């Protein structure tokens, strides 16, 4: 179920050295699913897509750690000090990073 104001988080681990590549899905700061990317697809390009099939007008806002609108009430940064997230991007002891040019190459 999705309600007005729900915040979804997506954390991707595509680091080959870490073992299996995964996508973690969170709703309001709690993990609701972890998807392991099959080996046959691990070299593919991943593009985030969101949609609504309810048949009513909806607004979906995406934030990849940049300057969100509206500003999160908690505004948590990643381990490198970048991003503005409503919930901590550290999940299960893994410090996920904001998708920004300053983080590219810092860990991958």
What is each of the regions a protein language model found here?
Residues 1-108:
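PRY/SPRY (B30.2) beta-sandwich protein-interaction domains
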